[in-house]
Amino acid sequence: DIGNQTWYTMYKKAKGIAVNNNVTSSMIWGSQWDATMRWMYNSGNEEKKKYTYDSTGKGNYSGTNGNQPIATGSIETYAVNNIYDMAENVRDWAIEAYGTILRDGRGGYYRNNGNSGPASIRSTNGSNEQQRRPWLSCSFIYVTLSPCM
């Protein structure tokens, strides 16, 4: 059960999975996440821009009863320049604090639909703060796993 874990416990577990499965794990900090969001928003491509505020049909949510997360990176067609799961299958914890909250959540998750949980969403204490202009957000850490070559 991962529902009752600390951020650090989950961080150590993810790091261990990466080492034990011969994959490279890289962390993307808030500034890098925001740069990706900014690039998508300003790309001139309406599909990429829309992904930052409405990921309907792109996010890894079940689309049914909201009780079925799917494996990270399992739907390759949802990648944007090899970046997976930006609309999330589960929320990610940020390493930076947000206000008085030590860790905030970013991205939607399997119980969201695409417009209530897009890539740019931030959540703290169960409330959502939608950021339509993603470069205004400031804290996120995202773990990406890829096979070692």
Task: Please tell me what each predicted stretch does.
Residues N4-A18, T24, I28, T77, ...:
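Disulfide-stabilized, aromatic/cysteine-rich ligand-recognition loop
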Residues A87-A97:
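Active-site-proximal beta-strands of protease catalytic cores
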